[in-house]
């Protein structure tokens, strides 16, 4: 089976600043390995992370009129109507490749024609780890001061709405595949999510309150589970699934 690895370093805001509340897009150096081939570029790593998350469930084929996987820039965040997804418009330069789903595998096609096949599970691990590293950098910096402009504000809101939804879905699927417990934090409390089978029994345990909730299936878990006094499904965009334990 093939190899896919992706890492980012030298993370910074515009002008190589360590912090900038006005810059919404994170930049840095990205190295991505496909088998024995390594591609490197400096680009907008926040856009890279979101499009990696998109490819957990969707194909992305290289196209001249589409953003690259490592775009040199990401000028505009274009939100959909209900602010659940965003498209990023950037420069016409960057590093790109195609990501194609084939059952339980992912096939990558590079501009050179080289192809690499990896398991979807391994791909999820890499994508979620990359996204987590980018999100941690955002969280360690000053909160963003989004301008009053509705277009920009909606784009930024939609960016994080889509990010959190896709990250959570990816982590939950990985947990189902591996049978391992998930950790999440919300409003300063720490929770642990575990399950027995795909649709058998889900449980939510709060470390601080020692409260244990049990639900017969994933759908019921999302519809009925409570975080504090709010339903899990109503808080999904704000939940931070931290890791698989």
Question: Where on the chain are the PLM-derived regions?
Answer:
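Mixed-charge, glycine-accented linear interaction segment located at domain edges/termini
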Residues: 102-167
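Short, exposed beta-strand/loop patches in secreted or surface proteins that constitute
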Residues: 23, 31, 79, 96-101, ...
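N-terminal "first-domain core" detector
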Residues: 1-49
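Negatively charged, low-complexity tracts enriched in Asp/Glu with abundant Ser/Thr
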Residues: 38-77, 165-185
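An exposed acidic His-Trp-rich patch
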Residues: 66-119
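Acidic, aromatic-enriched beta-alpha/helix-loop junctions
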Residues: 41-69, 197-234
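Short polybasic amphipathic segments
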Residues: 27-35, 88, 98, 106-109, ...
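Short strand-coil-strand connectors
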Residues: 33-35, 82, 89-94, 185-189
